[in-house]
Amino acid sequence: MRPRAPACAAAALGLCSLLLLLAPGHACPAGCACTDPHTVDCRDRGLPSVPDPFPLDVRKLLVAGNRIQRIPEDFFIFYGDLVYLDFRNNSLRSLEEGTFSGSAKLVFLDLSYNNLTQLGAGAFRSAGRLVKLSLANNNLVGVHEDAFETLESLQVLELNDNNLRSLSVAALAALPALRSLRLDGNPWLCDCDFAHLFSWIQENASKLPKGLDEIQCSLPMESRRISLRELSEASFSECRFSLSLTDLCIIIFSGVAVSIAAIISSFFLATVVQCLQRCAPNKDAEDEDEDKDD
């Protein structure tokens, strides 16, 4: 039985090592610095991926200035105590569904200066306590109307310096606590689709830290850009009479349906009239025969 002793000792040592690895306060990843028991600083290290492992009780993580392309899907499941995440100036291209699962304590999230192009529905669904979200200086061209659902505590949203030409008002209406919104630095297109957003912006101008002057848009069929300060509701008056594709489809379908109903009704009426006309001569002939018999 003695030969088993080294094996048992090795197993015990491995178990102890694993427990130390998973224990709160575990040593920082190589190349990073722990400035306090709950802060990990991995800024400007040229890292190609999120280093691992961190102390499980880390609350503030700084990974700005690296080459990281994705946030692991299970990242917040292991580091659910994270409150502050600085992910600026990386190579992040997309946010996979479920990326923020387990991020219930996250309050500050900076994803600026990355390569994001789209925000899908529920991109931050589990991050319900977020207070500040920065998406500035990305390549965003589209934001789903449900991208910010459940962010009822969000007060600061930065969407400036992207490639947005339009934005659904529904996406902003989902943010009841919003106090500050950056929209400047985008190539907005002042067409009829922009009319609803323009109305929202006018009603919530106090939430724009740089005001209407810094937000510019291009007029349809024109190359020049103008400040929203120069526009008014009257600028979109023609849009009140314009029809969307859905409206046009409904009108066309209704017209076709009415036409078909009219054709069927006309055919039925013509058939009835023809039957009556055929029956009338027979009735007259019967009346003449009765007169002769008399």
UniProtKB/Swiss-Prot annotation:
Membrane topology listed for this record: Single-pass type I membrane protein
GO MF annotations, alphabetized: potassium channel activator activity; transmembrane transporter binding; voltage-gated potassium channel activity
Cellular component GO terms, alphabetical: plasma membrane; voltage-gated potassium channel complex
Disulfide bonds: C28-C34, C32-C42, C190-C217, C192-C239
Record flagged with keyword Transmembrane: yes
Transmembrane segments: 250-270
Protein name (record): Leucine-rich repeat-containing protein 38
Species in which this protein is naturally found: Homo sapiens
